[in-house]
Amino acid sequence: MNRITIIGGGNIGLSLARGLVKAAYCDASSITITRRNLSSLEEEKKDGFNVSDQNPEAISDADYIVLAILPQQIRKVMDEIAPTLRADQTIISVASGVSCADIKEVLGQDKVVIRAMPNTAIAIGQSMTCISTDQADQEKIDEVSKMFESVGSVVVINEDLMTSATALCACGIAFFLRGIRAASQGGVEIGFHAHDALKMAIQTAKGAADLLLQMGSHPESEIDKVTSPKGCTIAGLNEMEHNGFSSAFIKGIKLSAKKAGGLYND
């Protein structure tokens, strides 16, 4: 069984570790999680995970090393682990805006590097994860894809689209959550109690997403089914569009993509 070291015990790192075990991809004993403050990993230790505050030691027997840290912190961590790395270890980076070339510049050109961009729905096994690489072979790509498929869906993309994937999938989950919040606030405006309005908005959003996933249909074809001539749905949609709904959404995604591309150098 492959051994995995996850450097960074934050939300993404811990969710990945727990998701892999829950999906029976591997045992907790096969995973080591590192964090500077070990007291925050007490629960994981009790659940059978290996924990450490020493990154070089933690990666010594790992087959896969996941860099689950902020882009602003990754250079320091790479400098720390570079002397310990072996050529047969695979590096998986989930840091936004840090290219395979950036990583190899520090860790060595002989290293196998694969980038992955999950989102916070990884905590419930529903992440949308995009994967890319520069030169990793198909076997490695398939293995990393299998790893992340245990915690959601996976799409393999070209590396030059990874900052775009960050905006659409990682930042995107916040955009959709803000839309749900706005819908619930609208529900309160028209007479519902806040908790009822939120429940209704959440389930409606879930139903809309499941319709597209299960029917394989396009959003507009499903919209057409609920818009009748002179009806209330088309009136509401047109009011939103007149106030820039789609335009604001698109502009937000584009700006997030631009920002994501510069995080490593900020």
Task: Locate the predicted segments by residue.
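Internal alpha-helical scaffold of NAD(P)-dependent oxidoreductase catalytic cores
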Residues: 102, 106-112, 128-164, 175-216, ...
